[in-house]
């Protein structure tokens, strides 16, 4: 069989005017070709027929899209709540252990003035302690961290759909969540618990 004359183009043996609209191009989920998932790797404003994370999350109406956006917003707020709960749990562990993490010991050190004269200054030295949580507490800390990380990972995957509306609500959700639950991280002194660390 001589294949030298055969072209490898898409029109090979097909009439370009042939109508395929009667064919079901769905993936077995009962979807017809008019409601296929639209996924774009460029910035887009797709609302109806957008799909997120799986074919089951197929947006079929504007109301469904609005519900998804509201859910994404609250997922981002939830991430900040989980972070706050983790910090509060760490503070509770340190406090329960009887360790004062915000006060260090006072120490006298030499201080030299402009004229070279030596004088004494009292400074607060950072606390020197190492608190190691018990295994049950560490397992609970791990679950708190893992749930926060998992939710943040799903938000990152949602952002990779480059839907401008989704991105705006991700930014708004994280901002509102931080405004509501991030006030404990602003302090004058260094607080181990506020930094999310207990050791």
Curated annotation (Swiss-Prot):
Domain of life: Eukaryota
Induction (record text): Expression is highly induced by the CUF1 copper regulatory factor in response to copper deprivation and repressed in presence of physiologically low concentrations of copper. Expressed at high levels after phagocytosis by macrophage-like cells and during infection of mouse brains, but only at low levels in lungs, consistent with limited copper availability during neurologic infection.
Residue stretches spanning the membrane: 62-82, 152-172
GO molecular function, one term: copper ion transmembrane transporter activity
Membrane topology per record: Multi-pass membrane protein
Subcellular localization: Membrane
Keywords in alphabetical order: Membrane, Transmembrane, Transmembrane helix
InterPro entries tied to this protein: Cop_transporter
Phenotype upon loss of function: Exhibits a significant reduction in survival in macrophages after activation with gamma interferon.
UniProt xrefs under Pfam families: Ctr (PF04145)
Gene Ontology CC entries for this record: membrane
Record's description of how this protein is used: The CTR4 copper-sensing promoter can be used to construct plasmids that offer efficient and regulated expression in C.neoformans.
Function recorded in the entry: Required for high affinity copper (probably reduced Cu I) transport into the cell. Plays a role in fungal pathogenesis during host infection.
Family: Belongs to the copper transporter (Ctr) (TC 1.A.56) family. SLC31A subfamily.
Entry protein name: Copper transport protein CTR4
Organism whose genome encodes this protein: Cryptococcus neoformans var. grubii serotype A (strain H99 / ATCC 208821 / CBS 10515 / FGSC 9487)
